[in-house]
UniProtKB/Swiss-Prot annotation:
The gene is GNP1. The modification Phosphoserine is found at residues 29, 113, 124. High affinity transport of glutamine. Also transports Leu, Ser, Thr, Cys, Met and Asn. One of its GO terms (biological process) is amino acid transmembrane transport. The lineage of its organism: Eukaryota, Fungi, Dikarya, Ascomycota, Saccharomycotina. This is High-affinity glutamine permease. It comes from the Eukaryota. Pfam families: AA_permease. It comes from Saccharomyces cerevisiae (strain ATCC 204508 / S288c).
């Protein structure tokens, strides 16, 4: 077949048409000369009169190679497109189906190695990694979401995930409202609750590590389906709003360097980056989050060192500062004890938002390779995040930034230098370092946006699998991505394009209003689920030895956290009806800015009760299903593993024993 006939779609093998010119040869890229050279050796003896035939055959062969290469490259595109097809075995449960106690069925995802499958064929009832599993349970295991998250990712999540808008930017307004003393007290109260919450969350996450959606599914079968439905949807809405909130914050952060470029330009760049990262699934999210968290932790450590030097007069232009700003203008804002107490209470919502995503280790349990080892380790390290990343760094900020500074959000100034961490350094004459801090703050904000995109899509997908959201959102593709739910998360991200609006700070405030208080509801349900689980275990005569990890603060820690969260909701209601500033007069805007999540939760709760006609307040302890969805650990095997581990520590170096005690 000649080149000319090939181009015209004809296949005349016997054609004598040899009309070729150099332009035809120029169409062939010289990158295929490796294919031409062997051909020259084979037909090197061709007579000169057959030169045209030689060139034609060579060109034909080269074009065939080019077509093959094109098909080869096209195969990547086809595989990428095919990866979005529904995974085999991925399907939603019927919304109409229910189990014996009337709760909505939960779809679980399990996976087992080839060794586990081989063991299943040889034994009728086996123990894998300390977990008892029957052959039927093994056969039902489906590889929907992929186990791409490693222990190093989980540990770094416990230390760095959530260090973003709440801590690095949102506290600017809180410092202005409460003063440094009120800020620290509010965060200390919330931090003590968070530690108890994470311990409860860690225990349940190990037990129910195969539940898609993590902790938002616990109350469905441990407490009350209506509570689970309302809080899960509120949690989903929270993180759908957090993604555009973080992108708006990123555009505000960029204003530190320039105000001449339209903020929407940067929103487009960051928006595309977040979507692309999540297209790579859990692995892309985990690796990006690991990098972001490393940068954030290094920035916090660097800030510690620099802030201490500035405060002691070793850098900057103000000499020794010490606790000057705690005396003038003071540690608390307000002239009366009531006003000062109100300032402390006002920190709770922002503190809850700042501590948000601490429970992310449970959300990712179904995509972790070894949750029984990684989750307890991460939960124990949470105390260091609370003490150093939050309390210590905010104390240093309070030493360096007076709450009357006009650069803080909520003061007379603008958001150009919104972060109190940047203000703490730049306001004392340090020139270069603030640029590095602001760059890491930008990475931190993008990290939380990345986590929000990941979390919201997984929550929406789990709601669909439970029958509590449209069935189309249960779609999991061949790469383990909840593709339909990710599309919804991407659409919500478009809200961020309001960054160029003059109402940018108002949008920031309203998105924060939805997100902050929602976190309290989520934490309350986690602790209630833990309390009800322990109660059901006791009533049904089950041993806690079946639990792979037990909360270090026990059920009393969960009870303390619930009590404090309820008091925080009550106190926040008081702040909403008598806001700080404006003479303490009630207005609809100030009320909903502080308490928007409450009416949303009430509406969702009532909607479920009417929809399902289920008027019970909770599932009785003796009716709680403690078999389905749960990893039942072999108590004797776990004891043996613990003894072997302790023996290795006793025989090992001293530093390992110290590290094990603290970590």
């Amino acid at each position: 077949m000649t080149l000319g006939n090939r181009r015209h779609g004809r296949n005349n093998e016997g054609s004598s048409n040899m009309n070729m010119n150099r332009n035809d040869l120029d169409d062939v890229s010289h990158y295929e000369m490796k294919e031409i050279q062997p051909k020259e050796k084979q037909i090197g003896s061709i007579e000169p009169e057959n030169e045209v035939e030689y060139f034609e055959k060579t060109v034909e062969k080269t074009i065939e190679n080019m077509e093959y290469e094109g098909e080869h490259h096209a195969s990547y595109l086809r595989r990428f497109i095919d990866s979005f097809r529904r995974a085999e075995g991925s399907h939603a449960n019927s919304p109409d189906s229910s189990n014996s106690n009337g709760t909505t069925p939960i779809s679980t995802k399990d996976s087992s190695s080839q060794l586990d499958n081989e063991l299943n064929r040889k034994s009728s009832y086996i123990t894998v990694d300390g977990i008892k599993q029957s052959p039927q349970e093994q056969e039902q295991k489906q590889e929907n979401l992929k186990k791409s998250i490693k222990p190093r990712h989980t540990v770094m999540m416990s230390l760095g995930t959530g260090i973003g808008t709440g801590l690095l930017v949102g506290n600017s307004k809180v410092l202005n409202n409460a003063g440094p003393g009120g800020l620290i007290i509010g965060y200390a109260i919330m931090g003590s609750c968070v530690y108890c919450i994470i311990q409860a969350c860690g225990e349940l996450a190990v037990i129910y590590s195969d539940l898609i959606g993590g902790f938002n599914t616990y109350p469905l079968f441990l407490v009350d389906p209506a509570l689970g439905f309302s809080v899960a949807w509120l949690f989903c809405l929270q993180w759908l709003c957090v993604c555009p909130l973080e992108l708006v914050t990123a555009s505000m952060t960029i204003k530190y360097w320039t105000t001449s470029v339209n903020p929407d330009v940067f929103v487009v760049i960051f928006y595309v980056l977040i979507v692309v990262i999540n297209v790579f699934g859990a692995k892309g999210y985990a690796e990006a989050d690991f990098f972001f968290n490393c940068c954030k932790i290094l920035m916090i450590v660097g800030f510690f060192i620099l802030a201490i030097i500035i405060d002691c007069g070793g850098a900057g232009t103000d000499g020794y500062i010490g606790s000057k700003y705690w005396r003038d203008p003071g540690a608390f804002r307000g002239d009366t004890p009531i006003q000062r107490f109100k300032g402390v209470v006002a920190t709770f919502v922002t503190a809850a938002f700042a501590f948000g995503m601490s429970e992310q280790l449970a959300m990712t349990a179904s995509e972790q390779s070894n949750p029984r080892k990684a989750i307890p380790s991460a939960a124990k390290k949470m105390i260091y995040r609370i003490l150093f990343v939050f309390l210590a760094s905010l104390t240093l900020v309070g030493f360096l930034v007076p709450y009357t500074s006009d650069q803080l959000l909520g003061a007379a100034g603008s958001a150009t230098k919104a972060s109190p961490y940047v203000i703490a350094v730049s306001s004392h004459g340090v020139r270069v370092v603030p640029h590095f801090i602001n760059a890491v703050i930008l990475l931190s904000v993008l990290s939380v946006a990345n986590g929000a995109f990941y979390t919201s899509s997984r929550i929406l997908m789990s709601l669909a699998k439970q029958g509590n959201a449209p069935k189309c959102f249960d779609y999991i593709d061949r790469e383990g991505r909840p593709a339909a739910a990710m599309l919804v998360s991407a659409l919500f991200g478009v809200i961020a394009f309001c960054a160029s609006s003059k109402k940018e700070e108002d949008v920031f405030t309203w998105l924060l209003a939805i997100s902050g208080l929602s976190q309290l509801f989520t934490w309350i349900t986690i602790c209630l689920s833990h309390i009800r689980f322990r109660r059901a275990m006791k009533v049904q005569g089950r041993s806690l030895g079946e639990v792979g990890y037990k909360s270090q603060v026990g059920v009393w820690g969960s009870a303390y956290a619930v009590l404090m969260m309820v008091l925080a909701l009550i106190a926040q209601f008081w702040v909403a009806i008598a806001p700080i500033g404006g003479g303490g007069k009630l207005s609809a805007q100030s009320f909903f800015e502080n308490y928007l999540a409450m009416p949303i939760w009430i509406a969702l709760y009532i909607f479920y009760k009417v929809w399902k006609k289920d008027w019970s307040l909770f599932i009785p302890a003796d009716k709680v299903d403690l078999v389905s969805h749960r990893n039942i650990f072999d108590e004797e095997l776990l004891k043996q593993e613990d003894e072997e581990y302790k023996e290795r520590l006793r025989n090992g170096p001293y530093w390992k024993r110290v590290l094990d005690f603290w970590c």
